[in-house]
């Protein structure tokens, strides 16, 4: 009986020692969280293994994740899988449908991004438009008009001179034939007679003032139809045109005048475009064809563009993200108690098995120690 009790006692003692030893060993992985000192000497095994090796563990985990788990090749493969492609395309379709069904405006979309679209468009249009025009003027103000304008345009203008001659003659005939033209001729003739006095008054002995005015009107109309008159007008216009096109730009229009005209054109352009109204109207009303185009063709192209663009620039993206450093920094920010609970939650069964194995091995060792003690 004494022998059996000795063996049982040794088994229980060995099991307790083995189990408790494993429990202490597991605890020592995490505890203590900080080193303890006696005088100036640090107590061995403080802090625990994981707190002590925390930075190294974080660095190794980051390295493993970057080099073996989340690699560039793996991400490329995932991006090009049909499931990923379909998911991206469905997301694009969803956003397009939202644009179509909701009263989403350009102003509202810009507002989400913190942009005042009306102010931005007005600023961009004003600065770009005026800067372009001012730059063009500064670059060309000392050049002749014939050097600035295309030759085809100059030839076309020259070809219009005969048409202008015919136009001027026709307008002159219409004016001279009108009641106003007849009245103006009579008034000018009356003024002329009054200024020239008696000598001119002698003409009235042979012709009345009305007949003289009628004669002048008839002759002026005839002159507008005479080929020689038309040739003279054409020659004058040609000479003026040649003189005009050989002038420098700044002789034709001064810099301040050009700026004033540019501002007037810009104001008219803004009024015509009415961009403020367009930014406050639903996109489906402003550009319905664009929404239809997005539905019919763009979603697939955008999906291809996103996948190809991401794959192409993935190396640079991964470098900028620096996954290894990101994981390392994140792990180093974790509270040690949180890390302990996390590991215990993950390996709870295995840790319990280790403690149980400690009890079993301790009991077996205790059994053999008891047997040996009987024979010693």
Swiss-Prot record:
InterPro entries listed in its UniProt record: DUF445, UCP032178
Predominant cellular place of this UniProt entry's protein: membrane
Compartments it resides in: Cell membrane
Top-level division of the source organism's lineage: Bacteria
Keywords in alphabetical order: Cell membrane, Membrane, Transmembrane, Transmembrane helix
Cellular component terms (Gene Ontology): plasma membrane
Transmembrane residue ranges: 4-24, 356-376
Signal peptide span: none
Pfam family, one: DUF445
Topology term for the membrane: Multi-pass membrane protein
Entry similarity comment: Belongs to the UPF0754 family.
UniProt-recorded name of the protein: UPF0754 membrane protein SERP1382
Species of provenance: Staphylococcus epidermidis (strain ATCC 35984 / DSM 28319 / BCRC 17069 / CCUG 31568 / BM 3577 / RP62A)
């Amino acid at each position: 009986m004494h022998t059996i009790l000795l063996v049982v006692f040794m088994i229980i003692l060995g099991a307790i020692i083995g189990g408790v030893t494993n429990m202490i060993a597991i605890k020592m992985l995490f505890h203590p969280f900080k080193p303890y000192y006696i005088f100036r000497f640090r107590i061995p095994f403080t802090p625990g293994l994981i707190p002590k090796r925390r930075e190294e563990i974080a660095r190794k985990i980051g390295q493993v994740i970057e080099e073996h788990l989340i690699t560039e090749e793996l991400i490329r493969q995932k991006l090009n899988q049909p499931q990923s492609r379909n998911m991206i395309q469905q997301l694009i379709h969803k956003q397009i449908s939202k644009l179509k069904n909701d009263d989403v405006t350009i102003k509202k979309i810009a507002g989400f991004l913190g942009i005042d679209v009306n102010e931005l468009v007005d600023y961009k249009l004003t600065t770009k438009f005026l800067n372009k025009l001012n730059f063009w003027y500064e670059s060309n103000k000392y050049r002749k008009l014939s050097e600035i304008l295309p030759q085809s345009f100059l030839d076309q203008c020259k070809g219009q001179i005969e048409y202008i001659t015919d136009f001027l003659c026709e307008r002159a005939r219409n004016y001279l034939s009108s009641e106003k033209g007849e009245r103006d001729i009579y008034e000018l003739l009356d003024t002329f007679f009054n200024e020239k006095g008696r000598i001119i008054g002698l003409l009235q002995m042979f012709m009345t003032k009305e007949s003289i005015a009628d004669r002048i009107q008839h002759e002026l109309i005839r002159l507008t139809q005479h080929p020689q008159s038309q040739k003279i007008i054409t020659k004058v216009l040609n000479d003026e045109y040649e003189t005009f096109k050989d002038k420098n730009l700044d002789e034709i229009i001064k810099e301040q005048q050009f700026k004033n005209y540019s501002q007037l054109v810009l104001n008219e352009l803004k009024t015509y475009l009415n961009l403020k109204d367009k930014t406050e109207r639903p996109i489906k009303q402003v550009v319905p064809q664009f929404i239809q185009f997005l539905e019919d063709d763009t979603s697939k192209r955008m999906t291809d563009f996103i996948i190809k663009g991401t794959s192409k620039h993935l190396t640079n993206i991964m470098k900028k993200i620096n996954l290894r450093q990101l994981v390392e920094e994140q792990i180093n920010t974790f509270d040690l108690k949180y890390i302990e609970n996390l590991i215990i939650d993950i390996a709870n069964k295995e840790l319990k098995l280790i403690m149980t194995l400690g009890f079993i091995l301790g009991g077996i060792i205790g059994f053999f120690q008891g047997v040996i003690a009987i024979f010693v």
